[in-house]
Amino acid sequence: MASDLSKKRKFKDSKGSKPERALASSSKAKKLKRAPTPEDSDAERDNSSDPEIENQEPEVEVPGPPQDNSEDQEAEENANAFERQDEPAGLDSAIQKGDGSLLGPSVSTDAQAFSELNLSDKTMMSINEMGFTKMTEIQRRGIPPLLAGKDVLGAAKTGSGKTLAFLIPAIEMLNSLRFKPRNGTGVIVVTPTRELALQIFGVARELMKNHSQTYGVVIGGANIRAEEDKLGKGVNLLIATPGRLLDHLRRGSFVFKNLKSLIIDEADRILEVGFEDEMRHIVKILPKENRQTMLFSATQTTKVEDLARISLRPGPLYINVDEEKQFSTVEGLDQGYVIVDADKRFLLLFSFLKKMAKKKIIVFLSSCNSVKYYSELLQYIDLQVLDLHGKQKQQKRTNTFFEFCNAKQGTLICTDVAARGLDIPQVDWIVQFDPPDDPRDYIHRVGRTARGNNTKGRSLLFLQPCELGFLAHLKAAKVPVVEYDFPKNKILNVQSQLEKLIGSNYYLNQSAKDGYRSYLHAYASHSLRSVFDVQKLDMVKVAKGFGFSTPPRVDITLGAGMSRDKKPQARRAYGSQPRQSGHQRR
């Protein structure tokens, strides 16, 4: 609340950098319909807890929002996710001779600009059209060895520009080997979420607009038969989520014997959301001979090391651009927290959003039902917001994502489905209304702002007095936060009106109960239970934050039985999926 919140050093209501150029709008985006699967990175637990476990960092345009076409056009819309261009006149034999390295003069490891990389004219033309000249650190250190055909294990903060770091060498390889559609797939990019896959697809489209190779995306929620048809015609660069990729590999939907490059993006997140078995099967199925592998992960866990061991060739190059940094979050990010009682949390949030109405803000909550309730409540009282969570159908999620990307101001209420990798331009504020599950999630949430070089952003964390122990965990993770204070008389006290509204409006009352229940389930399943102990909550105050004068009856033992760092054992088999049947996700 810049002017209203005064920290022990003031909020600065800086204007930040100028808005990026308008995001491209594509008429070729898809209508996505399918029952939710574990590929919704915010996979949630039925009945027990509602928290989401949910997305690189391309600092470029992303494909525009899909058109809301009729059901009978679904296959055609999904087919348009693939771009096909004129075939090159190259020799098929070039595919078999390639060893993954690129021909031409060697590249200086001291290169600072893209023009120093000896890239093809077609790629350089695209990079120039996208407005890039100088490389980020991960690009400077990663692209030259990747162009030389080396395997790379990379670690970099969100917003570091690693999408270009892995796409440029992959596209150069396809170009140098003169891949044709009939040669099948030469590059596969695996990413944890549908939104991130669509975003990487948008970056690939920009980079490949002057090339003759084909490219496409396959994700859960899309029409699998339409995907099969396009894959059968030849997709040289394929972007996929793990479950859908394994589907197509097992179905024999496409030619992958000529695969030269496997890219695993956000490897730690892929494994966190339960795709360990799928990734092992994928790596086992794909050809290993002459295959270059690029594995990027924000954190180096034991599972990531195991995946690297089975997927990379011996002696990969390890690149960590963050190990010597003083802080775990990016420069230009002003981070603070406020201490607020549970019954004042919504009042403070409402006052903040009213004050910052002309800013672009993302508000993170811990559960889908809480997002649904608060977004409905805010819109009911004439504060327009967008909402994004894993209970929504894919079409709705995709439309909301692109609408917020293109907006110059506004508020997005969301779960952690939006916390990882997604590049949303010019976000001014990150508000963590519900604290994250651990410091890593905090870092990824605040990574939605201050993205790229010389950009500014601000974040605000809400903490109740009983949650102050979380600050020690942030300090241990090298996250610098300072306390923000706020004048009590500046908070809009609408509590009595809120309770009256919830008591008289049946629809909002039911939504509030669902949100309250899900909040407590999420809290009870928190991985840092020494800090976030549901038994220490003042239930009367928590209930007031949802608009109740007295707490509704809720059984919180379900959430307490499962920590969010544990994954459900039962998984639906991939392949034929049931039709969407409404509310299946919590």
From Swiss-Prot:
GO CC list: nuclear envelope; nucleolus; preribosome, large subunit precursor; small-subunit processome
Binding site for ATP: A156, K157, T158, G159, S160, G161, K162, T163
Positions of region (Disordered): 1-107, 557-586
Polar residues: bias regions: 577-586
Biological process annotations from GO: maturation of LSU-rRNA from tricistronic rRNA transcript (SSU-rRNA, 5.8S rRNA, LSU-rRNA); maturation of SSU-rRNA from tricistronic rRNA transcript (SSU-rRNA, 5.8S rRNA, LSU-rRNA); snoRNA release from pre-rRNA
Task performed by this protein: ATP-dependent RNA helicase involved in 40S ribosomal subunit biogenesis. Required for the processing and cleavage of 35S pre-rRNA at sites A0, A1, and A2, leading to mature 18S rRNA.
CDD domains: DEADc_DDX18 (cd17942), SF2_C_DEAD (cd18787)
Organism: Chaetomium globosum (strain ATCC 6205 / CBS 148.51 / DSM 1962 / NBRC 6347 / NRRL 1970)
Enzyme class: hydrolase
Cell compartment(s), UniProt: Nucleus, Nucleolus
Ranges of residues in domain Helicase C-terminal: 332-502
The gene coding this protein: HAS1
UniProt-recorded Gene Ontology molecular function terms: ATP binding; ATP hydrolysis activity; identical protein binding; RNA binding; RNA helicase activity
Top-level taxon of the source organism: Eukaryota
Main location per the UniProt record: nucleus
Protein name stated in the entry: ATP-dependent RNA helicase HAS1
Compositional bias (Acidic residues): 39-60
Family: Belongs to the DEAD box helicase family. DDX18/HAS1 subfamily.
EC number per UniProt: 3.6.4.13
